[in-house]
Each structure stands twice: as C-alpha cells, then as structure tokens.
Amino acid sequence: MQGTKIRLLAGSLLMLASAGYVQADALQPDPAWQQGTLANGLQWQVLATPQRPSDRIEVRLQVNTGSLTESTQQSGFSHAIPRIALTQSGGLDAAQARSLWQQGFDPKRPMPPVIVSYDSTLYSLSLPNNRNDLLKEALTYLANVSGKLTITPETVNHALSSEDMVATWPADTKEGWWRYRLKGSALLGHDPAEPLKQPVDAAKIQAFYEKWYTPDAMTLIVVGNIDARSVAEQINKTFGTLKGKRETPAPVPTLSPLRAESVSIMTDAVRQDRLSIMWDTPWQPIRESAALLRYWQADLAREALFWHIQQELTKNNAKDIGLGFDCRVLFLRAQCAINIESPNDKLNTNLSLVANELAKVRDKGLSEEEFTALVAQKNLELQKLFATYARTDTDILTGQRMRSLQNQVVDIAPEQYQKLRQNFLNSLTVDMLNQNLRQQLSQEMALILLQPQGEPEFNMKALKATWDEIMVPATAAAVEADEAHPEVTETPAAQ
C-alpha cells in the first residue's frame, strides 16, 4: 500500500529501491521473480524461496480500484465489496472456506484480510508452508472474488450484519494530520471508510463491481517455498477464465505539494507532543541507472544527517528529547520528516537544538571523519548482503515487492545490487554528499506539531520565529546562489 515508512536503523539494508549506477541503462528485473500476463490481462508474479523453507506462503491479490472510483452516490461501494467477499465461500464449500481463513492468518504478523485505499484493494492470505492444497484453495477463492461474487440484497444485508474485517489505508482516514495533508486533493472527498448510503441498491453495487473488478486491473503475487512453474500453471488455469475489461481508466490519485506552513494539529495519534520538520518533492520512478545517483545520494545524505544530529545531541547530553526520522512515498510525493518528541514546555528549546545542527550541516557540511565512518558502515552492510537476504522472510519480501510496484521501482538481483552498490560507494566523495545536503536543507520546510487531544494549543508563531531566526537567512542566500548556478538547482528525489 501507499505511505510505507522507511526508518533508518543501524545495520539495515534497503533492498526495495535497488537500481543501477552511472550510465543511464534500463534496469534488468531480478530473474528469480517469474512473472507473466494472462490473455485476459491479469498480471502475476511468483517468487520461489528455497532459502526459506519454513516460512509461510504469502499470497496477495491487488485490484486497482478504491474509493477514488466512486461517485457521490456510490460512496462505500469499494469497502462493501470485500465485506461481501469475506462472507462468501468463494467457490469452496463452507467448511473449506472457514478452514482457509483460519489457517490463512499469520499470528506472528497479523494482517487484515483486505485493505481498501483510495486507488487499490488488497486481499492477503498467509498460508502454512508445505500446504499445496491450501494454496490451491486460496487461488480458487481469490479468483472467485475477482469476478464471480454473488451480489444480491440478501448477500449485501448478510455482509453488513457481519463483523467488518476490512481495514482501510490509512487506518484512521479522519485523523487530523491526514485530513490536513489531503487539502487541495480530490482524495478528500473519497474516504475509503465511508459507509454505504441508505437505502442500499445491490444492483448498483453489482454494476460497480463488474466495471472495476476486471482482470486487466489485477496483480497476483505468490511468495514462498513453492514450485514456481506449477503455481504459474495453477494461476493460468484458475484465473484465465475471468472476463471483463476496463473501459474507463481509474482516476490517478494525486497530492498537492506539502505547504511550508507552521501548524498545530490535535490528534489521538500521539500521547506526547511531536514536532515534525517536514519537506516533500515529486517521487521519481527508478527504472534506469541514472535514477540511482539521485536516489542513493539523497538517501545516504539523509541518513548521514540523522546520525549527525543524534550524535551531537548525545554529545551535548540533551535531555527530554526523542529524535526520529522517516521517509515515505505518498501517491508519488516523496515526503521526509525529522520528528522531535518533546515535553510541551521544552518544544522551543529542543527545536532550537535541532535547527542549529541543521544549519551547521547545511552551511559547513559533514566532516571527512564522519563521511569515512559512514562509508565504512555502508561497506560493512554490503559485505553482509547475502546473509541479510537469506534472513529476509517471505512476508518482508512480499511487502518490498508491493512497494516496488506501487512506486515504479525495478527490483534487480542481489548479485547485481552488490556490484552496483559497491561502485557507488567507491565513487562517492564528501563533497558530493555535502552538496546534496545543502540542496535538501535549503528547501522550504513545514513545521507540523501533533498534540494530544485536550492539550492547550501551542503558540506556533513562537516556534516559527525560532526556526526562522536560525534557518531562514542562510536559506534565502542559498536560493539566490542556486539561481545564479542553475546546474545545481535540481533537488534529488526523496524517499
């Protein structure tokens, strides 16, 4: 789904955005992933993982439709259809269907059976390993969901009277920060959690289902210790009979650029004040090697920035401050934030501490020693690449693949990744990294304060004044310098 966070953790290695380096060559997909398109347009991708024989078999069916395809009178249709699906046996007998859902749930990593968002609906099953019978039943069930649902007044009423097991992304579509972020976007009027309008017309839900649940708008993913060839044959046999074709393209979800404002938002999502220094840029797909320089340089610069600030706060024995950093792609907007967890009465002081470090890095850059230590750490991670890959379970591999598809990233093989990443690290210099940091830190940034419900609203003008006093004069100078040297004005894509 959209909005997946990427946290910078010691020793982590992001396999998601693998890409080539230097020449602008098209990237070659990892051949370990078998993939194809059926005659009816359904796309499938299968990864056999013999290195993980005990892992569960992960199955995902993504339908490219969500609440954004609904008209006002159709509100709630995209949420109602999977509710109906979950109350039907999907071409199995009732006992088989019950058994499938009981066993198709990973107790260690519980995941909703269906997640509905603005532009997609994701059906998920996690099956015990070595159960080819269950995998066959899962494919039968999902094929039935894809084009053979029984939608009548009786089945609709039965679904609505049953427990709602369908989740939304985001989980709370009415949360204050999320509603703020959607300002200026068509998404605001298309809530995937919206209930059906009364009275319910089953015939209209059926028409919506037939229009948007077409095989040419579906992607099926299977990952696990399986016989990939046999599974591909099962997919062709089970899903090949589905009918229908999209006659109307689905609307493309878009977000407005993040406004460089200072705002306070009351929310149940936090228990302590969280101030986010936030910026965003258009996300650039990674399909060819020229994208590597932009992505990897920007990504490594952000990681270096985070570790620098954290080390400086530790060195100065800073109290009552928690620091976090996350980046995510939201509908092809790449958004990053430095998050400051702080008591209410120390917000201004803690913002000042962080802003001063940001200004120092922007104006003076990282030291040669910091750069050398960072590259050494990245080289160490690279040496452990294959061990890391071997420890990556099927659930993680599946999630990474879903994100790659969502964000238009070509996954390459670990062997190629290792070679290209090594070349990248060998070619990187402290000056290249510092120029990237200057570019990123010279952007206008938003100050977003999330406060627990019931807390007195904080004076954001005071925070903005603190920020401007430290950051703005040099930012303005940097912008003027960039205008004089247009060859360095492009800000690399963030993730």
Swiss-Prot record:
Q: What Pfam families does the database record attribute to this sequence?
A: Peptidase_M16 (PF00675), Peptidase_M16_C (PF05193)
GO cellular component terms listed in the entry, alphabetical order: periplasmic space
Gene3D superfamilies under this entry? Metalloenzyme, LuxS/M16 peptidase-like
Q: Which UniProt keywords apply?
A: Hydrolase, Metalloprotease, Periplasm, Protease, Signal, Zinc
The entry sums up its family as follows:
Belongs to the peptidase M16 family.
Q: What further note is attached to this protein's record?
A: Has lost the active site residues.
Q: What is this protein called?
A: Protein YhjJ
Which organism is this entry from?
Answer: Salmonella typhi
Per the record, the gene is: yhjJ
